[in-house]
Amino acid sequence: KLNKKKKGGDELPTGAITKLEEVFDHIFWKRRKLIYNKYLEKGNIVEEDSLQLLSEVEGTTYWKNDEFLENEYLQGTPDNIFNRVRDTKSNYEFDTFKKAELTTLYSWQIKGYIWMAIGAGHKIERTGELCYCLINTPCHRIEAEIKSMWYSMGMPEIDEERWFKAASQLERNHIFDIAKFKEDYPKFDLYNSFWRDIPKHMRVKTFEVTLEDSDIEHMTRRSKMAKEWLLNREIEELELINSK
């Protein structure tokens, strides 16, 4: 997130400072906002399914990486390290997959992973990949979405045509490989009876990201600036505490 240069010098952008405020509250006050939502939940649950899909599409087995990487400035764990760094993002539904693009945040994330992996001794390319994967949504999440929609529609009778069509559409928006879904959840009672699977190769979107020497200089500089900001923030907070 530390990637914006303002006129008149290199300064931390507003977004970075907002994030640093959260980091400070977590470290100093041991308070932080708990982030857990349906998007993160699905991403965590289907992480290995995304790697499996990517493996099948590219004809290479990609194992989940569990190695925690860090250097003096960064830390993190990419999803896969094989010849190059790969990180998968599992979209929540069809619409979000169609709109998915390489964001600035994800680009810097991949660059950071490449830098740390090379520093840890991995013989990899300086080009990594961000891979969006469209994976079946877990059944309990589909059930939750159906229940929420049922309330939003005024609790219609389940045999009403408008309800049946809406529930069927919702299932199609979250299930892309019906054979695998039935294999994973054989007891799930589906509304929809007409299925058109999306081919596996059309359920992966890959963006390449290359690490340049200037990127390393930028991350190093911004990391030092962030540490200095946190130190000054601590001094301010201690002065405020001791002011009375």
Residue ranges and their predicted role:
Residues 39, 51-73, 78-79:
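A short acidic/basic microdomain associated with nuclease active sites
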Residues 1-45, 49, 53, 57, ...:
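Charged, glycine-rich intrinsically disordered N-terminal tails and low-complexity linkers that flank
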Residues 58, 66-69, 82-84, 89-92, ...:
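Short, flexible loop/turn elements at secondary-structure junctions
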Residues 193-244:
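Extended amphipathic secondary-structure runs
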Residues 25-26, 94, 108:
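Domain-wide signal for the mature, well-folded portions of proteins, strongly enriched
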Residues 48-58, 101-135:
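Metal-dependent nuclease catalytic cores in nucleic-acid-processing enzymes
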Residues 94-96, 137-141:
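Short catalytic/ligand-binding loop motif for oxyanion handling, primarily in non-cytosolic enzymes
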Residues 54, 78-97, 113:
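Conserved catalytic cores of phosphodiester-cleaving nucleases, focusing on short active-site segments
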